[in-house]
Amino acid sequence: MAQLNIKGRLAGDVTILDMDGRITIGEGSVALRGAIRRLLEEGKKKILLNLAGVGYIDSSGIGELVSSYTAINKDGGQLKLLSLTQKLQDLLTITKLLTVFDSYDNEADALSNFK
């Protein structure tokens, strides 16, 4: 689980990125940045990050989440988070970022909250 694997799938007009691995400085954050950039270039503006398989995220990974959120919002889109692990939820709470991101425990709830 050293690298970050990202698989994309569609649910209506929402792109879901199922992530497995670590979002860390270097490969993980670069993979996330590249995936988000490609989606925006394709005109996809509703993005749901499924973080159930993310075992670890460092400060660079947190920065990449914030950067992705900012880029998507600036482009008129929405970024939401799905299936936060307890560790990630605690980290986002401590950094006060849990108030910035919309996060959901199940996919159906997340999908129904896209506008």
Write out the residue ranges for each language-model feature:
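STAS-typified acidic loop motif
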Residues: N5-G34
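A short, charged, amphipathic alpha-helix used as a generic interaction element across diverse proteins
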Residues: F114-K115
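Short acidic-hydrophobic, aromatic-tinged amphipathic segments that line or gate anion-handling sites
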Residues: D102-N106
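Amphipathic alpha-helical interaction surfaces in cytosolic regulatory modules
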Residues: I23-F101
